[in-house]
């Protein structure tokens, strides 16, 4: 018999470790290809840019791809991957090339085949080509819309079609292997496997070996769609891959534990091709070839791998060293079997059912035929509340969820799809496998197409004959599901023991012998039928099931037995206590005889021994048919003892606790409802709490200590802490009048009264002079107050003398300074100097978005001899303050900080010596150059001058809100892959709290908009503009720029940090994107300023009411609305007001990804770090007079919820960071701006590449 490719490759894998190639994209980047290279001759007139579409290079630059393949092969790669990572019609649609998908794959395979055959001939060592199928840019498991968790922008069938087209091109190009790689969503991979199987069934025999490679996105060990490594393997192993493993996302060192997991749960060979380490701050990969090779050699020595290679950042040099490192290592020996005798299922997590697994509860309540509540919710389209039923089933112990949508009034496939998709958005539910239950096979298929895990299908039978049975079974196997087979054949439902056994035996052999089903994936349901009906022929139904179960388990190895338990007691509808007892007794016996699982109401099964003895005996008699009057006796029992109903859960049970327990519970849970009456109850207990202060120092502070401990341990999140603080304030607010009365009485008696301080310490907080941003500071204040610190919050724009005087007046233990804009850094230095001069030797904390440990260590700490500490966020503030005020820890902590900051300073000054800068003249010479005469002429705006927008419609802005920064305010940060919005809702740690805060935000937004609490105002302006070197001159309308004086000038800063010797990247300046004065091309520049008014006032109202949560919420939403205003207005500028991109049709996600033409950089940000450029904007457009947005002395905008910037329309304009500059540019810039060099250095401090001290 002729050897297949699989035989050939497997023979090599048994002998040695094979080597895969490295990063294709990494190598392509080295060629620094232009748009013209990507287009080639064929696509030079293509309507969309193609740069970045690496896969098209197999058509337009095949010689480059061929050369890269050769480099990897000569470096020692046994297997090269085709350049087809994004060669599906789905991914290519972004470039308008979806019609080329087949050709792209065929060409890529041809190029790789040519290289492999040439090197095989040259070296005498057989080389192989793996056809790469990437994950596409869409996902079946995650909704792109937070408002619609059930929505998907791609279907399983569409993915199958796309993958089938791709695989066909690869197979026609003669690839040896099909490699489904970088799998972040297992559902997508299952669609690829389905497509490949379609081709193998049609006309591509013999099948090619399949390699499968997933992607674990971080140290949590899960894919982007949430699956663990073992669950992923379980979900795709039905395809019988030759190799399975991991690639991308992680470096080798980080990937090791997950490769070990993969190896323990598969009989396939294991492949591993990690990135060259983790990306650095610039997104590049730094791990050297020798380091990467050392890590992978360790894998090999420990017997973990069969194939190794590289992904992102890896090069032929990496592959050469890896090949050499593993050359003499023995390959991993795959185990003959894993989890022998187990049924393997998966949701987001694996679920193994083995010989010693306890009875498996399949939750029954998500069934429109079995739960009236569930049916009502589904009929009403209330899928969100229907999910709560599923979640409750899991919480009550369901290990699998049965989903059934069989109702004549429902569109079954649609309802099943919608509900399964909704489940995928809830990790607490999606962690368990699903049992897709329907009598309509189209509904079953709809459910299977939504599930990334390995499901159970419930059910198929021989009712329609063998042909129908085999067809459905083959399709189920192709989906990778386990199957429930009913004891039902062409003659009807089996009721007798021998008939049940015969039907199941026949089905077993058809499944195992003809379809190739793993016996461990077969579940038989021998029919639990209703007893106690009064019909004699039904009396043996329970006994027949139990006896059939025993025989089936003894004669059909590997199978499991299940059944629908509620059928048993259907005669006793409405008598819940009777039904539950019957179920408990039946299961007690059926499990002993071999029943493995059942569809039950999880959590409602009584323990056999806990059933009342009289009821127990009656159930025993009925089930075992011991008493012909058992049914009547049970009915009489029900009449005597009551039918039994659902238990009522006491939701306010905590109200029965002691007053101390109630106060603590209210604080921890943030419940305001009873806090005043409970506080008053404590106050009236004069024996226990003789003074109101005793209540604050006692139960209230104890409760807040619990809150602080939970927050510090990561078990409470910031929004919850702030709600706790609101409750605390309300309690203290109730006690204050009584405390004041007590003090007044003491003063009358004693003439004076000594003030008592119950706090851990006093801290003065302030946003420094010239800065109006205070959300972060307010949050720190709330968190510190929750941890028994007395917080003196001085607000925003606080002068140094006021800060220091407050510290003296309140006998502060610590001062905390906050700031958002770069000029605030200088004010912080000034405060530190003044503290040193006035000998106020208390710790100084530094925080805020613009601050850093480096700036604190280098610029602030040397000015002050007491502790100066940079605090990252609110969660760190408590620890820092506690250590600074603890006499036992303070000195050691300060010493540690001193040493750490000294190291930072040394590193900083060493880095200044190492940094190299090109002279300004050279940077200008190598700036970004545009051929203005060959480019389309700039579009003239629809008006010159300004247009003011009064009372802008806030409702229009809501869809443009970017929610990620909103969650950052609340310090709710999901772990990868759940960092962004709406993925954060899927995060196991913060997802639930994030959703609560988001819902609160939605409610607040409705109030703000409907009640007109806030007002949005803005201004836009356009002027003729020309560049002169690094500056942009603006002119009045109608003049000839070459013969006129500019009405304003915006000064630019140019990149100077020396670039890599091989780099052709230009040294950017914003002026590069405006036509030069001498070009003869008329160009234009725009500007804008927008703000939300009323935020501070409304926030202050909430704060005065003791509602810190709403106070911070208003500010956070004010900032988001201002940013949304800027986004929405920029869209209008592009399409209407400037109209240089009239046909733009972009969704909000595209706007977020900056897929539009033009940019809107802001002074004070990386592309122009100088805040003083705002002065020109405000003067030119009369911004303060037009809108009310003013500039502070530090050039922060007031109100704080404000955004401003410039508009550039050129299609080649892009955002960049100026980075550090050298002194020659500072001096030149000062000369052009007619400012003293020292003044310019003050404003540009953070970007100076030299020390000014």
Swiss-Prot record:
SMART domains (alphabetical): B12-binding_2
Pfam families in the cross-refs: B12-binding, B12-binding_2, Met_synt_B12, Pterin_bind, S-methyl_trans
Keyword annotations from UniProtKB, A to Z: Amino-acid biosynthesis, Cobalamin, Cobalt, Cytoplasm, Metal-binding, Methionine biosynthesis, Methyltransferase, Phosphoprotein, Repeat, S-adenosyl-L-methionine, Transferase, Zinc
Cofactor note: Binds 1 zinc ion per subunit.
PROSITE patterns, A to Z: ADOMET_ACTIVATION, B12_BINDING, B12_BINDING_NTER, HCY, PTERIN_BINDING
Domain Pterin-binding: start-end pairs: 359-620
Chain positions recorded as methylcob(III)alamin binding sites: 697, 770-774, 818, 822, 874
Gene Ontology CC: cytoplasm
Descriptive protein name: Methionine synthase
């Amino acid at each position: 018999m002729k050897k297949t490719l699989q035989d050939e490759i497997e023979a090599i894998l048994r002998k040695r470790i094979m080597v895969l190639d490295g990063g294709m994209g990494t190598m392509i980047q080295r060629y620094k290809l232009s748009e013209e290279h990507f287009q080639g001759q064929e696509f030079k007139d293509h309507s969309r840019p193609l740069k970045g579409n690496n896969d098209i290079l197999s058509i337009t630059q095949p010689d480059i791809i061929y050369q890269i393949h050769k480099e990897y092969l000569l470096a020692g790669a046994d297997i090269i991957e085709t350049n087809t990572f994004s060669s599906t019609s789905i991914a290519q649609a972004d470039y308008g090339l979806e019609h080329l998908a087949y050709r792209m794959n065929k060409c890529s395979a041809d190029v790789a085949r040519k290289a492999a055959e040439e090197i095989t001939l040259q070296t005498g060592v057989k080389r192989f080509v793996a056809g790469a199928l990437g994950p596409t840019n869409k996902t079946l498991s995650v909704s792109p819309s937070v408002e619609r968790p059930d929505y998907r922008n791609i279907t399983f069938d569409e993915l199958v079609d796309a993958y089938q087209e791709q695989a066909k091109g690869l197979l026609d190009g003669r690839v040896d292997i099909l490699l489904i790689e970088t799998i972040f969503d297992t559902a997508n991979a299952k669609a690829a496997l389905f497509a490949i199987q379609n081709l193998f069934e049609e006309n591509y025999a013999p099948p090619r070996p399949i390699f499968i490679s997933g992607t674990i996105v971080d140290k949590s060990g899960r894919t982007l769609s949430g699956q663990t490594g073992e669950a992923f393997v379980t979900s795709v192993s039905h395809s019988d891959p030759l190799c399975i493993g991991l690639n991308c996302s992680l470096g080798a060192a980080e990937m090791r534990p997950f490769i070990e997991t993969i190896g323990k749960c598969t009989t396939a060979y294991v492949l591993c091709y990690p990135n060259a380490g983790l990306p650095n701050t610039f997104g590049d990969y730094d791990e050297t070839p020798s380091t990467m090779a050392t890590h992978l050699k360790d894998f090999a020595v420990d017997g973990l791998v069969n194939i190794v290679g590289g992904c992102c950042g890896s090069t032929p040099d990496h592959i050469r060293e890896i090949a050499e490192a593993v050359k003499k290592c023995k390959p991993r020996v795959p185990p003959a079997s894993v989890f022998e005798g187990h049924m393997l299922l998966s949701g987001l997590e694996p679920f193994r059912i083995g010989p010693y697994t306890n009875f498996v509860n399949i939750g029954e309540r998500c069934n429109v035929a079995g739960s009236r509540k569930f049916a009502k919710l589904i009929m009403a389209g209330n899928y969100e509340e229907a999910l709560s039923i599923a979640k409750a089933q899991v919480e009550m112990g369901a290990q699998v969820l049965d989903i059934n949508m069989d109702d004549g009034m429902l569109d079954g496939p649609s309802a099943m799809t919608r509900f399964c998709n909704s489940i995928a958005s809830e990790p607490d539910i999606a962690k368990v496998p699903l049992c897709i239950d329907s009598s309509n096979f189209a509904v079953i298929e709809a459910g299977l197409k939504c599930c990334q895990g390995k499901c159970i299908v419930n059910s198929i039978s021989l009712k329609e004959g063998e042909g129908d049975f085999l067809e459905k079974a083959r399709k189920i196997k192709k989906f990778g599901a386990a199957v429930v087979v009913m004891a039902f054949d062409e003659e009807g439902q089996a009721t007798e023991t021998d008939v049940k056994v015969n039907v199941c035996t026949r089905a077993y052999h058809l499944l195992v012998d003809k379809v190739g089903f793993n016996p461990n994936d077969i579940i038989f349901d021998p029919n639990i039928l209703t007893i106690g009906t009064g019909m004699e022929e039904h009396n043996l139904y329970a006994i027949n099931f139990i006896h059939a179960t025993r025989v089936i388990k003894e004669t059909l190895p590997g199978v499991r037995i299940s059944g629908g338990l509620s059928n048993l007691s259907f005669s006793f509808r409405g008598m819940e206590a009777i039904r539950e007892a019957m179920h408990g007794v039946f299961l007690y016996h059926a499990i002993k005889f071999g029943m493995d699982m059942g569809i039950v109401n999880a959590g409602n099964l009584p323990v056999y021994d806990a059933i009342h003895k009289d009821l127990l005996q009656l159930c025993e008699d009925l089930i075992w048919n011991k008493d012909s009057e058992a049914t009547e006796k049970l009915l009489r029992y029900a009449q005597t003892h009551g039918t039994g109903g659902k238990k009522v859960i006491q939701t306010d049970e905590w109200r029965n606790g002691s007053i101390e327990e109630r106060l603590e519970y209210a604080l921890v849970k943030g419940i305001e409802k009873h806090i005043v009456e409970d506080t008053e109850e404590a106050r009236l207990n004069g024996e226990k709490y003789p003074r109101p202060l005793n209540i604050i120092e006692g139960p209230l502070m104890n409760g807040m200590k619990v809150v602080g401990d939970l927050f510090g341990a990561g078990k409470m999140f910031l929004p919850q802490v702030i709600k706790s603080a609101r409750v605390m304030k309300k309690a203290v607010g109730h006690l204050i009048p009584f405390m004041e009365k007590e003090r007044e009485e003491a003063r009358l008696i004693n003439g004076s009264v000594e003030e008592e301080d119950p706090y851990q310490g006093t801290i003065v907080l302030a946003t420094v002079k010239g800065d109006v941003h205070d959300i972060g500071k307010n949050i720190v204040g709330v968190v510190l107050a929750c941890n028994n610190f007395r917080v003196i919050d001085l607000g925003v724009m606080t002068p140094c003398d006021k800060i220091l005087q407050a510290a003296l007046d309140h006998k502060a233990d610590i001062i905390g300074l906050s700031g958002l804009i770069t000029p605030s850094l200088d004010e912080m230095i000034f405060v530190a100097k003044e503290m040193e001069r006035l000998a106020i030797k208390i710790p100084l904390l530094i925080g805020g978005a613009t601050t850093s440990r480096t700036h604190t260590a280098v610029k602030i700490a040397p000015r002050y001899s007491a502790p100066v500490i940079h605090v990252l966020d609110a969660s760190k503030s408590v620890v820092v303050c506690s250590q600074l005020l603890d006499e036992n820890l303070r000195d050691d902590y300060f010493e540690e900080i001193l040493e750490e900051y000294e190291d930072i300073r040394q590193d900083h000054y060493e880095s200044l010596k190492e940094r190299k800068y090109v002279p300004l003249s050279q940077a200008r010479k190598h700036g970004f150059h545009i051929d203005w005469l060959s480019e389309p002429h700039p579009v003239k705006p629809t008006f010159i001058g300004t247009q003011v927008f009064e009372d802008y419609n806030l409702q229009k802005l809501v869809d443009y809100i970017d929610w990620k920064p909103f969650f950052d305010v609340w310090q709710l940060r999901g772990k990868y892959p759940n960092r962004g919005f709406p993925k954060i809702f899927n995060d196991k740690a913060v997802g639930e709290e994030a959703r609560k805060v988001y819902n609160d935000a939605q409610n607040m937004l409705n109030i703000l908009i409907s009640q007109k609490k806030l007002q949005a105002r803005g201004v836009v302006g356009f002027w003729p503009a020309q560049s002169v070197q690094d500056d942009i001159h603006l002119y009045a309308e109608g003049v000839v720029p070459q013969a006129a004086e500019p009405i304003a000038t915006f000064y630019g800063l140019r990149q100077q940090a020396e670039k890599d010797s091989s780099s052709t990247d230009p040294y950017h300046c914003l002026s590069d994107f405006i036509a030069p004065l001498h070009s003869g091309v008329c160009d234009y520049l725009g500007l804008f300023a927008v703000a939300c008014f009323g935020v501070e006032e409304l926030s202050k109202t909430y704060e005065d009411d003791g509602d810190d949560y709403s106070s911070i919420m208003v500010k956070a939403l004010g900032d988001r609305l201002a940013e949304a205003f800027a986004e929405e207005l920029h869209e209008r500028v592009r399409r209407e007001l400037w109209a240089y991109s009239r046909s733009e049709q972009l969704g909000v996600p595209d706007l977020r990804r900056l897929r539009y033409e033009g940019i809107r950089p802001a002074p004070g940000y990386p592309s122009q770090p100088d805040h003083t450029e705002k002065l020109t904007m405000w003067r030119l457009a009369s911004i303060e007079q037009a809108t009310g947005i003013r500039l502070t002395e530090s050039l922060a905008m007031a109100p704080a919820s404000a955004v401003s910037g410039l508009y550039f329309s050129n299609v080649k304009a892009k955002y960049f960071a100026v980075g550090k500059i050298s002194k020659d540019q500072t001096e030149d810039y000062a000369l052009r701006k007619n400012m003293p060099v020292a003044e310019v250095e003050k404003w540009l401090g953070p970007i100076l590449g030299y020390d000014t001290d």
